[in-house]
Amino acid sequence: MNRLLQRQLFLENLLVGTNSMFHQISKHSINTCCRSL
């Protein structure tokens, strides 16, 4: 049970980290596109 819970927490952290990273990248690319226009 404990191991399964740890695995779930790890997967959730991974998902949140990837999500925030993706948002930062998309925000940065949108800003770059707006500046080049």
From Swiss-Prot:
Lineage: Viruses, Riboviria, Orthornavirae, Duplornaviricota, Resentoviricetes
Subcellular localization, as worded in the UniProt entry: Host cytoplasm; Host mitochondrion
Cellular component aspect of the GO annotation: host cell mitochondrion
Assembly description: Interacts with NSP2 and NSP5.
A family per Pfam: Rota_NS6
Stored InterPro entries: Rotavirus_NSP6
Alphabetical keyword list: Host cytoplasm, Host mitochondrion
Species per Swiss-Prot/TrEMBL record: Rotavirus A (strain RVA/Human/United States/D/1974/G1P1A[8]) (RV-A)
HAMAP family referenced in this protein's UniProt entry, alphabetically: ROTA_NSP6 (MF_04093)
Protein name: Non-structural protein 6
Family label: Belongs to the rotavirus A NSP6 family.
